[in-house]
A protein has these predicted regions:
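Basic, flexible Lys/Arg- and Gly-enriched helix-loop patches that mediate nucleic-acid binding at interfaces
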Residues: 1-278
Length: 278
């Protein structure tokens, strides 16, 4: 049975489908003796090369997902030419496959990031087709008027695309911010464009001084996961995310992983401090 090259590599944990498609477009992938093209179909017997290194036609990688609480000051890419610390430096090692990020957060944004071993799942969770909600806590400087809120919910042209918040909730009382020139809001987006939250507020003349993602679809950042730490999603939670994007995945009862996840959660909970926004 054959399948598209980009899906073949994504399902084996080499990267998200979007990443693999970019590698193919850049000429970094060869199929047998020819430069690969997007849409090429492959079977287990074909020879695939990435950056002149032969790709092992390994079995499908088991699907795992971790929830990571990103601190400010870390870069969300796998490499950084300026030598800044990476989120990937804090992730647990894998025997097979690699961690693939479901989207990114910029260096000055903190909060929830999802990482998975399933490239196809990562691609679908990011894809605009599924319009998965992302919720953020955002602190802006200045007095926000009703007209600003209405404009942000109606839609703003940023570049050549319209963006908008699906919802905006005032959160000052909840977070007990005593500095009234700083206003906290919880906002919801149905997409993950670069700097979208900041750009929307800037369109109304407001600077964002703090930004924290608190949920991605049904996954909420647990209060026991402190900045720089992570926790595994259960098989039930993984299946829920996969169903959300119409993806059938094989889940095996990995007792070793379950025990490791339970130990990790007990360790994090024993520290006893909740994640707070300052």
């Amino acid at each position: 049975m054959d399948e598209k090259l980009q899906k073949f590599l994504a399902n084996r944990g080499y990267g998200s489908r979007r990443q693999v498609e970019q590698w193919i477009s850049d000429g970094r992938v060869r199929l047998n003796n020819s430069v690969a093209k997007i849409g090429d179909r492959v079977s287990i017997n074909d020879s695939i090369f990435l950056d002149n290194k032969k790709v092992r036609s390994r079995e499908l990688v088991e699907t795992h997902i971790i929830v990571y609480n990103k601190p400010e000051g870390l870069v969300s890419t796998t490499k950084d030419t300026r030598g800044r610390p990476l989120v990937f430096d804090n992730l647990p090692p894998l025997k097979r496959g690699k961690w693939i990020s479901v989207g990114r957060l910029d260096i000055n944004t903190s909060g929830l990031m999802l990482f998975t071993t399933n490239g196809e799942l990562a691609n679908r969770l990011m894809h605009p087709k599924y319009s998965i909600d992302r919720k953020y806590l955002v602190r802006v400087y200045g007095k926000v008027e009703k007209k600003n809120i209405e404009a942000l919910k109606k839609g703003i042209l940023i570049g050549d695309e319209y963006s908008r918040f699906k919802s905006i909730e005032f959160k000052n009382e909840v977070l007990k911010d005593q500095v009234r020139l700083n206003n906290w809001f919880q906002v919801t987006l149905g997409s993950g464009k670069n700097r979208e939250v900041r750009s929307l507020w800037e369109s109304q003349g407001f600077d964002v001084s703090r930004l924290k993602r608190i949920s991605y679809g049904p996954v909420i950042l647990p209060s026991f996961v402190r900045p720089g730490n992570y926790t595994y999603l259960s098989e039930k939670e993984v299946a829920q995310l996969a169903n959300l994007v119409n993806l059938n995945i094989a889940l095996r009862n990995d007792l070793t992983l379950q025990k490791k996840s339970q130990r990790n959660e007990r360790r994090l909970r024993s520290k006893g401090s909740k994640v707070k926004v300052r």
